[in-house]
């Protein structure tokens, strides 16, 4: 399973939902980058993703986007192959 990286904050309900969703798909480790705790992390996230909101989710080197994007990817049948790559 590829590494999962997620940019998050402490008070983000979509971050919690994304983590729960990924764990329900068998993901046992998510590297969380807390943009509210680490100086410069939000700017780095915005440079990397082009987005300002959290969560921002990477599966391996693939930028999935936020929770809605993750859900849409799953509905389209693209999440499981990405998790198994």
Task: Specify the residue positions occupied by each region the protein language model found.
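Residue-level recognition of specific faces of alpha-helices
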Residues: 3, 14, 56, 66-69
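Methionine-biased hydrophobic packing positions in alpha-helices, especially
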Residues: 6, 45-46
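Chalcogenol-based redox active-site neighborhoods
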Residues: 20, 47, 80
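Thiol/disulfide oxidoreductase modules built on the thioredoxin-like
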Residues: 47-53
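Alpha-helix termination/capping residues and helix-transition junctions
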Residues: 24-27, 51, 64
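Local sequence-structure signature of Cys/Sec-based thiol-disulfide redox active-site neighborhoods
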Residues: 1-29
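Non-catalytic, surface beta->alpha helical segment in thiol-disulfide oxidoreductase systems
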Residues: 59-85
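Thiol-based oxidoreductase modules, predominantly thioredoxin-like and allied folds used
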Residues: 28-42
């Amino acid at each position: 399973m590829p590494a999962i990286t997620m940019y998050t904050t402490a008070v983000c309900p979509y971050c919690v939902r994304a983590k729960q969703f990924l764990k329900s798909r068998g993901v046992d480790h998510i590297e969380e980058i807390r943009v509210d705790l680490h100086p410069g992390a939000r700017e780095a996230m915005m440079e990397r993703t082009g987005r300002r909101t959290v969560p921002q989710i990477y599966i391996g080197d693939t930028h999935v986007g936020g929770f809605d994007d993750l859900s849409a990817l799953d509905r389209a049948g693209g999440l499981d192959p990405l998790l198994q790559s």
